[in-house]
Amino acid sequence: MRRSVTTTIRVEWGDCDPAGIVYYPRFFHWCDVATWNLFAACGLPLIELQKRYGIVGFPLLEASATFRVPSRPQDLIVIATSLGPLRRKTLELRHAFSRDGAALLEAREVRVWAHHDTTRPNGLRAAAIPPEVVARLTASAPP
């Protein structure tokens, strides 16, 4: 069974638009927070990955979301994040947002293991995800 993690977020007034509901980009920010919480739970914090492997990180290739119910200030949101398909250079993450057990949003991200590409300005290049990183991401969660 692949790793999963939960992240809890309290919606603040500043997260909302003039209608008093969460402004949609905030959900993508919270997906990013939850993604790195999953990596940290696997013993793979971003700073350590950058130092050890010289990567930029796991930039997004795709991001999508299906919105079910609006969220408002002071809502306590739980994000259940799990690893989806893992390929040679990319991985998929799935985020299920809920409030009091009710589904709010489902989001999906595809990220790529990336290094700087020194042959072009601001360039990135995809590389294979190291086997030890794959092993940590796919290991069963400790009891």
PLM region descriptions:
Residues 23-27, 66, 96:
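Intrinsic disorder/low-structure terminal segments
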Residues 52-75:
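A contiguous binding-surface segment within folded domains or other stable secondary-structure elements
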Residues 1-60, 116-143:
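Hot-dog-fold acyl-thioester-processing enzymes
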